[in-house]
């Protein structure tokens, strides 16, 4: 791809994302499906703007690589050890059972047994990028089903090596392509990477951080991620697995949060590129020629994987309310199928259109997952938001709620308990099924689902409620919900949680004046206690705290028009000088 073509492709990708994703979100089908549809539109079987799909698809796998690095940062080695049973138990069982069933079905459709085995293994894998993205969107990350889903995905990444090694054996060319010496060298290189990373990464980043240049730190982070991916690719292993291990090795370091911040923008863009590339790879010619075969294959693939995953979740002890989420989010084929099937094709394991048919099946199965998860959400909403059983009725009044609390994490729990203790009628909206089960057990009136859906807000009693308290984890969700409430329920008093100063500015700009910065009040109270321990009179410390709070709020309001501007820096300096003058005047008054 030449320079001008590459630039044109970049512009087309950005345009497709900007146009399709907001439209898909407005239609309620999710960003992932929007990316896939955008890829179909600009790909060789759509408008034909881009034809070199394979090269772009390989490059776009970097999105998955960055995502796995960030996930690794969130898991320390001890946490990974705790997941060993689910990784090597449920993960291994899912791959083996799904592969066996799917291979058997492929043999019934004129696939040779060798091709059927490869096809079964490839179809048994799920899409790491899609599953993790959907788990985040659905708030599954910290739930039991989310942890189990991650374990299955991690085992699938580990299974890449034996799967690729199996291909030449099945093709009858083991003597030429299966060199045990090379495999031994690869294992040694992998172990060397683990040991080197364990003892070298933190000192290296400590040295880089000492320079104080943020750009160098970002460059070093990119070098680590891309270097790990390149090293693993050279070994014939999963690039995503390499960056995941690098993330785990740095999970307990003091640079974890800085690393996440440096990588996050690249991860989002490249993940979008990956999904667009998958959409572009959909061969509509094969789909049209073998429509019935493909449709049946997609249905069977999704059904088999859901059945296996659901049964494993049940055996593992996952709550019944979470099993369908777990099964649905992993029900699609994955990106590894593109690599495995290409390798098998080069070994002449497939005949005719067999490889193309399998790839179309994988791509379409990925497109069904967002829609399937919406159906699962609707089913769960009916299960949890319908009439309650007699023995599950909350002790609060059954009248319409006075307050709706959105999100019931640690922040929302404190608010909910306070309101309940004062006999206020509250309704909670939560999308974590584990939390929903727990809250119902303790007498809360709770609705499961996405609070940005107007129908759910209406069902929860937003039209009759007096106030809504928004405690979402993501600032984007908070602002979207504020906009929806102002548009559809203008009578509601909106109170919101602000994670930091930037979000507080955004809330003020949106007209929300009742908000709480989650760390500000507690930090201010601890600061007051610190002043007292340093010898300041308690009353004086209390006044200092009050002055600081008032000045900070005034600064916050004054800086709304320019909160992203450099003028804020000089204004902040003035505010610090003003605060210092207030403290000095107080000290002088105390001495008199």
From Swiss-Prot:
Q: What is the lineage of its organism?
A: Bacteria, Pseudomonadati, Pseudomonadota, Gammaproteobacteria, Enterobacterales
The subcellular location is:
Cell inner membrane
Q: Which GO terms describe its biological process?
A: proton transmembrane transport
The protein's name is Glutathione-regulated potassium-efflux system protein KefB
What InterPro entries does its record include? Cation/H_exchanger_TM (IPR006153), K/H_exchanger (IPR004771), K_H_efflux_KefB (IPR020884), Na+/solute_symporter_sf (IPR038770), NAD(P)-bd_dom_sf (IPR036291), RCK_N (IPR003148)
Q: Which HAMAP family match?
A: K_H_efflux_KefB
PROSITE patterns reported in the protein's UniProt record:
RCK_N
- Spell out the molecular function terms from Gene Ontology: glutathione-regulated potassium exporter activity
Membrane topology, as annotated, equals:
Multi-pass membrane protein
User: Could you tell me the keywords of this UniProt record?
Assistant: Antiport, Cell inner membrane, Cell membrane, Ion transport, Membrane, Potassium, Potassium transport, Transmembrane, Transmembrane helix, Transport
Main location class: membrane
Q: Which Pfam families match?
A: Na_H_Exchanger (PF00999), TrkA_N (PF02254)
Transmembrane residues, as ranges?
Answer: 4-24, 29-49, 55-75, 87-107, 115-135, 152-172, 177-197, 207-227, 230-250, 268-288, 291-311, 324-344, 356-376
Task: Give residue ranges for domain RCK N-terminal.
Answer: 400-519
**Coiled coil residues, start to end:** none
The organism's superkingdom is given as Bacteria
Supply the source organism for this entry: Escherichia coli O157:H7
| Family to which this protein belongs | Belongs to the monovalent cation:proton antiporter 2 (CPA2) transporter (TC 2.A.37) family. KefB subfamily.
How this chain assembles, per its entry, is: Interacts with the regulatory subunit KefG.
Keyword DNA damage among UniProt keywords: no
What is the role of the protein in this entry?
Pore-forming subunit of a potassium efflux system that confers protection against electrophiles. Catalyzes K(+)/H(+) antiport.
A single Gene Ontology CC term: plasma membrane
What residue range is the signal peptide? Answer: none
């Amino acid at each position: 791809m030449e320079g001008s073509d590459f630039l044109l492709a970049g512009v087309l990708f950005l345009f497709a994302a900007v146009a399709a994703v907001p439209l898909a979100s407005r239609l309620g089908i999710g960003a992932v499906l929007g990316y896939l549809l955008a890829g179909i539109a600009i790909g060789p079987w759509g408008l034909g703007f881009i034809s070199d799909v394979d090269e772009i698809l390989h490059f776009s796998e970097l999105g998955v690589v960055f995502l796995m690095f960030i996930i690794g940062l969130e898991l320390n080695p001890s946490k990974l050890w705790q997941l060993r049973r689910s990784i090597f138990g449920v993960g291994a069982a899912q791959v083996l059972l799904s592969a066996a069933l799917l291979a058997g079905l492929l043999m019934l459709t004129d696939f040779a047994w060798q091709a059927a085995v490869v096809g079964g293994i490839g179809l048994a894998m799920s899409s790491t990028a899609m599953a993790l993205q959907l788990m985040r969107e659905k708030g599954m990350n910290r739930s039991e089903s989310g942890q189990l889903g991650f374990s299955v995905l991690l085992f699938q990444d580990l299974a890449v090596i034996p799967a690729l090694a199996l291909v030449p054996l099945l093709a009858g060319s083991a003597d030429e392509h299966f060199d045990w010496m090379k495999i031994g060298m690869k294992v040694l290189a992998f172990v060397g990477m683990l040991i080197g990373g364990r003892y070298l990464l933190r000192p290296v980043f400590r040295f880089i951080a000492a320079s104080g240049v943020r750009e160098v730190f970002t460059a070093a982070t990119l070098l680590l991620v891309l270097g790990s991916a390149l090293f693993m690719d050279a070994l014939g292993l999963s690039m995503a697995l390499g960056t995941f291990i690098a993330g785990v090795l740095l999970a307990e370091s003091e640079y974890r949060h800085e690393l996440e911040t440096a990588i996050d923008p690249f991860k989002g863009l490249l993940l979008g590129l990956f999904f667009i590339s998958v959409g572009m790879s959909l061969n509509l010619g094969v789909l049209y020629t073998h429509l019935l075969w493909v449709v049946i294959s997609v249905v069977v693939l999704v059904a088999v994987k859901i059945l296996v995953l659901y049964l494993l979740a049940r055996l593992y002890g996952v709550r019944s309310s979470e099993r369908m989420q777990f099964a649905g989010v992993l029900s699609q084929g994955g990106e590894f199928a593109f690599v495995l099937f290409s390798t098998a094709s080069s070994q002449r394991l497939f005949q005719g259109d067999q490889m193309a048919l399998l790839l179309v099946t994988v791509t379409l199965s990925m497109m069904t997952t967002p829609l399937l998860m919406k159906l699962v959400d609707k089913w769960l909403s009916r299960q949890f938001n319908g009439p309650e059983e007699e023995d599950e009725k909350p002790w609060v009044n059954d009248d319409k709620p006075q307050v709706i609390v959105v999100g019931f994490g640690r922040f929302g729990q404190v608010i909910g308990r306070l309101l309940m203790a004062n006999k206020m009628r509250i309704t909670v909206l939560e999308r974590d099924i584990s939390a929903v089960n727990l809250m119902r057990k303790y007498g809360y009136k709770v609705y499961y689902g996405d609070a940005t859906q107007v129908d759910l807000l209406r069902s929860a009693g937003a039209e009759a409620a007096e106030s809504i308290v928004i405690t979402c984890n993501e600032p984007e969700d908070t602002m979207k919900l504020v906009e929806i409430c102002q548009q559809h329920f203008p009578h509601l008093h909106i109170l919101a949680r602000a994670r930091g100063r930037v979000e507080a500015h955004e809330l003020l700009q949106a007209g929300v004046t009742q908000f709480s910065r989650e760390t500000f009040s507690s930090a201010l109270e601890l600061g007051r206690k610190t002043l007292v321990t340093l010898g300041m009179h308690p009353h004086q410390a209390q006044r200092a705290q009050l002055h600081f709070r008032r000045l900070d709020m005034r600064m916050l309001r004054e800086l709304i028009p320019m909160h992203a501007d450099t003028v804020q820096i000089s204004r902040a300096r003035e505010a610090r000088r003003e605060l210092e003058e207030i403290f000095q005047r107080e000290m002088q008054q105390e001495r008199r």
